Amino acid sequence: DLIKKGLSFSTPTGTAYEYSNLGYAMLGYIIKRVTGKPYEQYINETIIRPLGMTSTYWEFSKIPKRQLAHGYRWINNNWQEEALLSHGAYGAMGGLITSLEDFIKYMNLHMNAWPPRHDTEATVAKRSSLREMHKPWNFSTLNAQYKYPGGRPCAVASAYGYGLRWTSDCEGRTTVGHSGGLPGFGSNWTFLPEYGIGVICFANVTYAPTSIINTKVLDTILAISKIKPRQLIPSRILLQRQQELMEILPGWNTKGKNIFAENFFLDYSINALRSEANELFTKAGQIKQVKEIVPTNNLRGAFIIEGEHSNIEVRFTLTPEQVPLIQEYRIREIPK
């Protein structure tokens, strides 16, 4: 009836981001129309049960009393209990009742989508589909004055994915997660895809600042633990091309070396390449070791040649053909 009467829009459709509880209630109705099942039944069958979430409910009256948390609001210097809300059409936007132990299973589903790989897929959703949810599809804000709860200034860009909030800060840290609140409750879950860590905060206080709490917790964990982002494992072809490049450096004797794209030497003069490499190797002195390539992706990376007096960085990019060949090459001195 609400939709039949017509809706009022804050902005012209498709022009701006604005969160809408009504939008998620409509999605719940769409699930029913498409599947022929109430959205809660469909979600139970396709997500909740396959993940083994045995302490997750839609209706508070079905929860064992010893497991049910009651919500409160701080009013006039006193805690007042909030009435629990019964399940209904708007449950699609915030009606799920769960435990930390259960929700960890759901968060792990998202965390296990990273890093991208070709392992056996999960039964609930493909990793690629989950990563689609994690993308910043709709930019919302850039807060150049943002400060972490500890007071450290760091600009943060925010966007919205598929039902999830996305942020990226001045240190290159990306977070994905979601917050929620109802009278008597507040919640947030946030994870860092490139670090493999996440936190969940549930509170039985009206609109508790769980997002701020989790942000501070994650920032503290990273500061104390010194955890670094995941490192991509070099592909076999990157390792192979690195070895083959080292076999021709610095003299650039490419005879019998079919490792370059057909247009490589149209972009580069072999005499200039040879002169540049010889000069850098002479400056470096005796070569101590060649470090393993650090990949940017499966077809691009850089490695360091450690010399007695200076180091050398070599970067290269491969073509996307079946047997990738060197398309782009850069070399430079890294002073010690």
Regions found by a protein language model. Name each.
Residues 1-181:
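Short, surface-exposed loop or secondary-structure junction motifs
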Residues 103-106, 255-257, 316:
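Hydrophobic pocket/interface hotspot
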Residues 114, 183, 206-208, 332-335:
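A short acidic/small-residue loop/turn micro-motif
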Residues 177, 188-191, 195-204, 313-315, ...:
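Short, well-ordered beta-strand elements
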Residues 183-186, 310-312:
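Short, small/polar residue-rich loop motifs at catalytic or cofactor-binding pockets
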Residues 254-296:
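Short solvent-exposed beta->alpha transition segments
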Residues 292-336:
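Exposed beta-sheet edge and beta->alpha loop/turn motif
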